[in-house]
Every structure is written in structure tokens, then in C-alpha cells.
Amino acid sequence: MLLLVEDQSFFNHPGVDVKEIVRVLRDYWLYDKPIRGASTLTQQLIKNTLLTREQTLSRKFNEVLMALLLESAFDKDFILNRYMNTVYLAQQGNKAIYGFEKGAKFYFNQPIGTLSAEEMATLVALVKGPDYYHPIKQAQRLAKRRQLVLTIYHKFEKIVK
């Protein structure tokens, strides 16, 4: 579910998705803003664990370079596992909740392997911004994002069957 929403070509790119970058550049040219992001899961992992949040060209260049280096040093399963264990999903007082396993316990009080599709979609929805999609403060916003995740997931399910 995560890859369907965040990086459908994860297993087919070298850490950077050139087609998505070209699409974002086109969007900038046509609309003066991107319609959606182009960062791969590998780039998100680099950004979340090694770089600052500043939005500069030099930071983006470093992110791309480091993603390419990471992909040349580690296999996709390692990178995906690392992402799933380090992605920020919640804040509980002064304690941050990182990773899907801890997120499942925090939000649903159960191991990740026992989550329903809707519960898993909630965690995937939160990846985009745990504060922006806060389950209590922004319940409607989260519900809309969760529904989008489920729609993408169910479309893929139909294609596979």
C-alpha cells in the first residue's frame, strides 16, 4: 500500500525517478508550482534521516546525490525496511513515534500484521504529514486522504486480479 501511494516505481529506479522530476519541472513551467512531489522513497529516507527540511536547490541536489549513492550501496529491501522503521508518524508529548510498527501500536494498539486495510491506509496517509493529517485535530482531512489511499489500493487490487 505504501509503495502504491508514495513510490510506484520504487523497484525500477536507481533512487531518483527522472520521469517524475521532468513532470514536476513541466508543472512549474505550466502552473508555476508542482502539482505533486517527485521524491522517491529513497529520497524521502535521505531527507528524513540525514538532511534538513530547508527547500533549497543545493539541499535537493544533495538529496538526489545521496539517494543515488544509497541505492548503489544497499538493496531495495534494506532501503524499504529502513524507511518503514524510521518514518515519522506521530508525536506523543515530547516523544516522537517513528516507523509503521510503532505507529500501529500507538494509533491502534496492535501489531502491524493485524491491521485492517483501513487502519493500514491511515498510517500510509499519515506519512504525508502527521500533523497536517492529525487524527483528532484534522479528522476530516485525514479521512479524505485515507480514502484516497484506499482508492489507489483497490484500483491496483482490481488490476492484479
Language-model segments: what does each one mean?
Residues 1-42, 82, 93-103:
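Flexible, acidic/glycine-enriched loop-and-adjacent beta/alpha segments
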Residues 46-161:
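Non-catalytic, structured segments within soluble enzyme domains
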